[in-house]
Amino acid sequence: MDSASVLQHPRRNLGSRHRSQADRFVKLAKQDPSRESENLAWAEQNAQQAVLFDFTDERNWRCLAIVKKMRNDGEGLALVLEDLFIVLGRDHVQLSQLKGVNHLDVGLELLEAAFITDSLDPENWFSSLEGDDLENFTNRCRRLDFTDQRANIIYGRRLERIRIAGHEDLFIDLVQHLLAHRPANHELWMELGRLHERRNEIDQAWLCYDHVQQLRPTDKVRD
């Protein structure tokens, strides 16, 4: 795994630690107006690190967005939302809707609306599905660009939740789209291989395990 991949792989403990630090500096900024600017600068730095280390935790995004608003940084808040939409796999039409919006007024509302309809947590996301949502998700997976590793990871976890719910054929179908955009996703190759093995599709299973072995030579997937 290269250095960029390491940075983009979720590290929950570090994310939580930096978010706690950001929260502490926000409290200090509120308590001491004379040092508000300095403390908010530290809060923003830690909030950015929290998102960097764990983009899968909605609290980290919320923390960063709140600090941006407290600093009256509408442009910065717009960039936070744009980055979040990329992670959520939103298409270009939805991204274009962010243009011309007063983000200081509605930025936090847009953030919360995104989490309600498109939670980063795979369990919350799956439990919110109703009606034609699964079909819409399927169509979405087939047309979106998943070259951003963060989006690839988020959608990979959603597909795993779909597989657990019994939609194995749908998992096998859609996972191909994610792997086509990001063939270095060893976790998805491993899950796909295990599924093929459970289904007694041995040739397909070994093809997946071969990919894992090439990506992570130290893993003894063939044993």
Language-model features: locations:
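The core hydrophobic/aromatic register in alpha-helical repeat solenoids, strongest
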Residues: 68, 162-163, 196
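The canonical alpha-helical register within tetratricopeptide repeats
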Residues: 42, 49, 83, 174-177, ...
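Intrinsically disordered, low-complexity, charge-biased linker/tail regions
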Residues: 1-28, 32-35, 79-173, 203-206, ...
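Short coil/turn motifs that N-cap or connect alpha-helices
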Residues: 56-57, 183-186, 217-221
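Amphipathic alpha-helices of TPR/Sel1-like and other helical repeat/solenoid scaffolds
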Residues: 39-50, 137-141, 171-178
